């Protein structure tokens, strides 16, 4: 007799290649870059990065690396009588010092609110006329005019090397007698909040950093540059 042997069909099992990990997203790559950069800094360098200071009268370039500064704020004395090329070169010299020191670009800020506080457009070499106050811009064409004015500021400041405008003023004032009134939107809290939100969004779109001021709010208080203010408003009103 013949024995028949039944066999299971052969199965060809190939080793499977392990799945490649997913490519990191741009956000993940950026986060890792930040972590690596942070890990490379000394404690002293990390502390220096917390300081966003006024440009000193002397040693402005060397101070960037001496103190590992996070940023410089330019005031009227730093922009007065300078041509655009001269100001660009000055700001670039600060950035060059930061690049050699920590490799982290500086925040370069200025107060260019429009109206009474115009550290850049007050110099006729940098702009033919001063930027208008928020109230004047609004009176000339509503929020459309305000946002057009914001864009023009952002483009001018960016071209000169600034990346932060210490603006907009978020204080609420409806009384022309208030110290802060001329620098504010001049309307109630709801209208001011809407104005601030739209301006900040426009600045972000233009790549310009914004700073809301003044905390916790001037209201109708006196000028704290020259004295001490005591706010007498009840908490509910505040």
Predicted features along the sequence, with ranges:
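N-terminal, intrinsically disordered, polar/charged segments of Gram-positive cell-envelope systems
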Residues: 2-36
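DNA-contacting surface of Y-family translesion DNA polymerases
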Residues: 25-89, 118
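Short coil/turn connectors at secondary-structure junctions
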Residues: 47-48, 102-105, 206-208
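Enzymes and membrane/adaptor proteins characterized by extended Gly/Ser/Thr/Asp/Glu-rich
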Residues: 63-192, 214, 219-235
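Metal-dependent enolase-superfamily TIM-barrel catalytic cores that perform enediolate-based chemistry
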Residues: 195-198, 202-206, 212
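Glycine-rich anion/phosphate-binding loop at the beta-strand->alpha-helix junction
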Residues: 238
């Amino acid at each position: 007799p013949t024995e028949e042997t039944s066999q299971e069909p052969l199965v060809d099992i190939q080793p499977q290649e392990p799945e490649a990990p997913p490519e990191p997203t741009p956000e993940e790559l950026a986060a890792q870059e930040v972590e690596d950069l942070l890990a490379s800094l000394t404690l002293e360098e990390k502390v220096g990065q917390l300081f966003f200071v006024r440009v000193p009268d002397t040693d402005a370039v060397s101070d960037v690396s001496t103190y590992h500064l996070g940023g410089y704020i330019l005031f009227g004395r730093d922009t007065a009588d300078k041509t655009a090329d001269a100001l660009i070169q000055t700001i670039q010299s600060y950035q060059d010092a930061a690049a050699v020191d920590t490799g982290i670009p500086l925040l370069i800020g200025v107060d260019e609110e429009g109206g009474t506080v115009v550290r850049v457009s007050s110099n006729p070499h940098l702009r033919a006329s001063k930027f208008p106050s928020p109230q004047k811009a609004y009176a000339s064409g509503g929020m459309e005019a305000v946002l057009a004015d914001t864009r023009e500021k952002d483009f001018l400041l960016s071209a000169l090397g600034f990346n932060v405008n210490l603006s907009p003023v978020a204080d609420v004032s409806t009384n022309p007698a208030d110290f802060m009134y001329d620098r504010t939107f001049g309307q109630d809290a709801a209208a001011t909040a809407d104005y601030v939100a739209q301006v900040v969004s426009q600045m972000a779109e233009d790549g310009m950093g914004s700073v809301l001021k003044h905390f916790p709010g001037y209201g109708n208080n006196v000028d704290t540059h020259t004295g001490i203010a005591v706010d007498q408003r009840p908490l509910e009103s505040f």
